[in-house]
Structure formats: structure tokens, C-alpha cells
């Protein structure tokens, strides 16, 4: 198998939920879920953390992830796009490990509801379809062809034109959940968008839709994890 790099990007300055990446959900720090899922997938020799926080780095190392650089300030503010952060982690990892990774898989630290099986199936889809990159999503609960609107000149207009009278008749749409990103090395180095001519989509269970950006998100995810009642070996 070609060597795959796993990255988990977790900055310390979260505004919506303070210290969310190391806040505990059912006795485990949130970032621990992604680290353990990566380990359980058996896809990776290296699980690398990109962070600007010494506290996050310490917690991540406790669970077996590797932290050998500190993310620079210009890549750690709330306006920084994620692709440059992943690209930085890839190049630093290649220099550190003296190897060239063919593929990078990034796991969002604030999306703990995925499983190791999700990671494996997403990678299998990526390989089978020979995608340049892959994003994950869930079936959308709202549809721009049917029940999403915009305001233009103080009037309501449909987000997408179309004569669809039921949700079932409208084109299927998907809500990106930011849980898993997969890139071929060359694509990541040469592009600044996740939308390319050969981008794949892996559809996940709707329960994985929650990316923790608010206290409400945190409470919902905490409840869903408690319902599953999983131990780390089941992640």
C-alpha cells in the first residue's frame, strides 16, 4: 500500500467553543476521537497534528499522535483557509520523515462522530474511482431547488431555479460535513479549492453532520456519543 499521511489540524483559538479541541466529551478530549479513529483504521504509519497550541500538542501526544512542529501564526487565525494548513503539514512531514507521501487524509478535529470504518470506506472510494481528491457529506435536509431561499432587492427568490413541488422530485443535494478530506499529493500542492474536475464524494450517515462550532453543537454531539455508548476500541 502506498504510504498515506494522516493530518489533524487543531488550532487553539476557537471562538465558538472555548478550547473545544481538548474539551472532554464522555471522558475523552475531543481531539482524541480523531486520533483513535485514525489508529483503528490501520491506514497510517504517521498521524500528524498541526497546531499552534502547546496544550493541544501535549494532549495529542498522550494519545500517540506526532507533533514535531508548531503551526505559524499566519496559518492559525480564524480567517485562514484549511488547504494551506494541510499543505504546510504535508511538506513539513515529508521533510521530517524523509519520504514522499502519495496521499493525505485529513480528519477534522471537531467532527468526532465518524468511525474508523468511515475513514476506510472513504479511502476505498477514493482509490476505486481514481479521484484527485475526495470530500465527505451527508444527505441535505434542505434543498436549494425546493426550500432554500435568498433575499434580493428586499424580495424572496429561490436559491436555485426549478419547478419542483416536492422535496422528493428535486435533485439530490448534499451537505458537506468537513469530516474527512482526501488528496493526492499533486492536487493538494497545486490547488486552492476542494472542488476540482475529478473530486469524489463519500456520503456518510446523517448523524455525522455535526461539526462543533457552538455550545449547542457540543451538547448535541455529547448526547449522540453517549447514546452510542462506545469504547475507544469501537471507534
Swiss-Prot record:
It catalyses: N,N-diacetyllegionaminate + CTP = CMP-N,N-diacetyllegionaminate + diphosphate. Keywords: Bacterial flagellum biogenesis, Nucleotidyltransferase, Transferase. It is an enzyme of class 2 (transferase). Gene3D superfamilies: Spore Coat Polysaccharide Biosynthesis Protein SpsA, Chain A. It holds the Pfam family CTP_transf_3. One of its GO terms (molecular function) is N-acylneuraminate cytidylyltransferase activity. GO terms for biological process: bacterial-type flagellum organization; lipopolysaccharide biosynthetic process. It comes from the Bacteria. Its EC number is 2.7.7.82. Involved in biosynthesis of legionaminic acid (5,7-diamino-3,5,7,9-tetradeoxy-D-glycero-D-galacto-non-2-ulosonic acid)(Leg), a sialic acid-like derivative that is incorporated into flagellin via O-linkage to Ser/Thr. Catalyzes the conversion of N,N'-diacetyllegionaminic acid (Leg5Ac7Ac) and CTP into CMP-N,N'-diacetyllegionaminic acid (CMP-Leg5Ac7Ac). PANTHER family: HAD SUPERFAMILY MEMBERS CMAS AND KDSC, N-ACYLNEURAMINATE CYTIDYLYLTRANSFERASE-RELATED. Belongs to the CMP-NeuNAc synthase family. This is CMP-N,N'-diacetyllegionaminic acid synthase. It comes from Campylobacter jejuni subsp. jejuni serotype O:2 (strain ATCC 700819 / NCTC 11168). The gene is legF.
